[in-house]
Amino acid sequence: MTWRATVLTLFPEMFPGPLGVSLAGRALASGLWGLEARDIRDSATDRHRSVDDTPAGGGPGMVLRADVLAAAIDAVDAAADRPRLVMSPRGRPLTQARVAELAAGPGPLIVCGRFEGIDQRVIDARGLEEVSIGDYVLSGGEIAAMALIDACVRLLPGVMGKLESSTDESFSAGLLEYPQYTRPQTFEGRPIPEVLLSGDHGKVAAWRLGEAEALTRARRPDLWAARPAQTIRAKGESQKTPKNKTDG
C-alpha cells in the first residue's frame, strides 16, 4: 500500500507547494507516495460555507467549528484506521522517532487549523493527536504539515538515493549531524580537515562521531542527556551476545 497523506485545510491550493519539487516532488510524481488536500469548507452546510464562529466566553478572533470539522474528518477517514494529527503549537514536539513511526504506517490525516484555533470538542471526539514543530506560532497549520510530510517522505522506501543518507542525518542516532565538506579543498584560507582526506575510514568515522557528540553537547543538551542511557543499553546488548562455540 502506498503511503498517503490527507490534509484538511481552508487553503488546499497551498499543496503540494514545496512538496512538489526536489526529492519529495520526484517521489510524488513516481507514485512512491500520495497526497490529497481537501477543503474544510466543502463540509459546511450553509450557503456562505461558514466554518468558524466567535470564541465561547469572549475573546478575539474566530474558532473553527467542531461540527464542520468533524464532518470533514468523517468524509475522508470514517474508519479511523490511521493517525489523525492536528498541527498545534501546544502539541507534543515532533521528533525523528515519531516521524519514523508515521513513515512506517499508512500515512496520516492532518488537520490544519486557522484563526484562534479549533473547538476542543472535535479534538477530543475524533482523537486528534496535537503535534508541534516548534515553540512559535504560525498563521496556520499548512506549513507545519508540509514540514511533517517532508520528514516522513524522505524515510519511505525508494525515496532516498542511498540508505545511509537518512541514517547518518541529525537525530537518527540521537546526535546532531557532523559538519560536511566538499571541494574546493581550501576556501578563504579554511582547509578541509586533514582526516577527511586521509582515506582511513576508521579515522573518518571516529572524527565524525566526535564532532557529532561535541555539537550535541553544546547545542542540544537535552539530546545529550538522553545519550548515556542509549550507550549503556547498546553496551549491555553487546555483552549479551553469545560467543561462537568451538567444535569438540
Swiss-Prot record:
Subcellular location: Cytoplasm
EC number: 2.1.1.228
Cysteine disulfide partners in this protein: none
Reactions it catalyzes: guanosine(37) in tRNA + S-adenosyl-L-methionine = N(1)-methylguanosine(37) in tRNA + S-adenosyl-L-homocysteine + H(+)
Any GO CC annotation of this UniProt entry: cytosol
Gene Ontology BP, a term: tRNA N1-guanine methylation
Keyword annotations from UniProtKB, A to Z: Cytoplasm, Methyltransferase, S-adenosyl-L-methionine, Transferase, tRNA processing
Pfam families for this protein: tRNA_m1G_MT
Region (Disordered): 226-248
Binding, S-adenosyl-L-methionine: G113, I133, G134, D135, Y136, V137, L138
Biased composition (Basic and acidic residues): 234-248
GO MF, one example: tRNA (guanine(37)-N1)-methyltransferase activity
Quaternary data: Homodimer.
Record PANTHER family: TRNA (GUANINE-N(1)-)-METHYLTRANSFERASE (PTHR46417:SF1)
Function: Specifically methylates guanosine-37 in various tRNAs.
Family: Belongs to the RNA methyltransferase TrmD family.
Protein name as catalogued: tRNA (guanine-N(1)-)-methyltransferase
UniProt gene name: trmD
